[in-house]
């Protein structure tokens, strides 16, 4: 197999350059006995974050964990990856500037769904994001709390902010801006926005109809649903597999991988909409 066209890592800013290139080489080496003998296609799989699973023609994304099989040599890997794993930060970064043909198709299918990972783990908690606003424009100080709650931090470039999870950038803020709306418009596929605000938050018609971005109405006993971690927001995430209902989605993203109630490893969550 010829050497693949290596590209720089497009999303994981907390991994060293040496490790990034090491990952590329490891992915390349995994394809030695791949059943599709087409160097250009295999190179595209490698560049798009995939390694061979050694089961049929199935490959797994190193960034979101999705496993995809039933490839064709003429598949546009960028399209397949972004379509079958729409919240993968790596896939979206690569595909965002692509112009895909309207009649593009694929026979590829998902064997196992992935789980996206964030770009800036150290900024997963709102308090860590709030701490980045020391040099934020004074005229926009009133926005900083809500911007941090919406998953963004100050990049120290003017009024530019970036999402800790998807790394999308938002700038040119106005005092009356809604940070959640600005974030969702910048990247409708941001996994963090979808998890916290609900699927379809960017759809203005649906937002007007169901108002998923509105805070849940208060009701008697709401204090009992207070997040056990931040003691501020309402709980809205059931942790799996332990099924403890103890945290809000904001704090879920900042967990150390264990349930704060029982310390069991957390594999996933169920989003709860409290009304």
From Swiss-Prot:
Q: Which residue intervals correspond to the BIR repeats? A: 24-91, 126-193
**Zn-finger segments (RING-type):** 227-263
InterPro entries named in the record: BIR_rpt, IAP, Znf_RING, Znf_RING/FYVE/PHD
Cell inner membrane: is it a keyword of this entry? no
Q: Which GO terms describe its molecular function?
A: zinc ion binding
Q: Where is the signal peptide?
A: none
* Protein task: Acts by blocking cellular apoptosis rather than by preventing viral stimulation of apoptosis.
PANTHER family of this UniProt entry?
Answer: INHIBITOR OF APOPTOSIS
Q: What is this protein called?
A: Apoptosis inhibitor 1
Which gene is annotated as encoding this protein in its UniProt record? IAP1
């Amino acid at each position: 197999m010829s050497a693949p066209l290596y590209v720089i890592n497009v999303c994981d800013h907390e991994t060293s350059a040496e490790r990034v290139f090491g990952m590329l080489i490891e992915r390349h080496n995994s394809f030695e006995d791949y059943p599709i003998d087409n160097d250009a296609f295999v190179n595209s799989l490698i560049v798009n974050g995939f390694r061979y699973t050694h089961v049929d023609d199935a490959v797994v994304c190193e960034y979101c964990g999705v496993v995809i099989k039933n490839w064709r040599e003429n598949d546009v890997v960028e399209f397949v990856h972004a379509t079958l794993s729409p919240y993968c930060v790596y896939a979206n970064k690569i595909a965002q500037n692509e112009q895909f043909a309207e009649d593009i198709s694929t026979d590829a299918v998902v064997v196992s769904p992935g789980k996206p990972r964030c770009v800036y783990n150290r900024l997963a908690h709102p308090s860590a994001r709030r701490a980045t606003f020391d040099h934020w424009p004074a005229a926009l100080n009133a926005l900083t709390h809500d911007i941090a709650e919406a998953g963004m931090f100050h990049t120290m470039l003017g009024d530019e902010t970036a999402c800790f999870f998807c790394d999308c950038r938002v700038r040119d803020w106005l005092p009356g801006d809604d940070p959640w709306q600005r974030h969702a418009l910048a990247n409708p596929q941001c996994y963090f926005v979808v998890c916290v605000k609900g699927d379809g938050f960017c759809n203005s018609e649906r937002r007007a109809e169901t108002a998923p971005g509105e805070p849940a109405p208060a009701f008697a006993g709401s204090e009992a649903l207070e997040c056990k971690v931040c003691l501020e927001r309402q709980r809205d995430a059931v942790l799996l597999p332990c099924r403890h209902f103890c945290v809000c989605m904001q704090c879920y993203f900042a967990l150390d991988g264990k349930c704060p109630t029982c310390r069991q490893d957390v594999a996933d969550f169920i989003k709860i909409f409290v009304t």
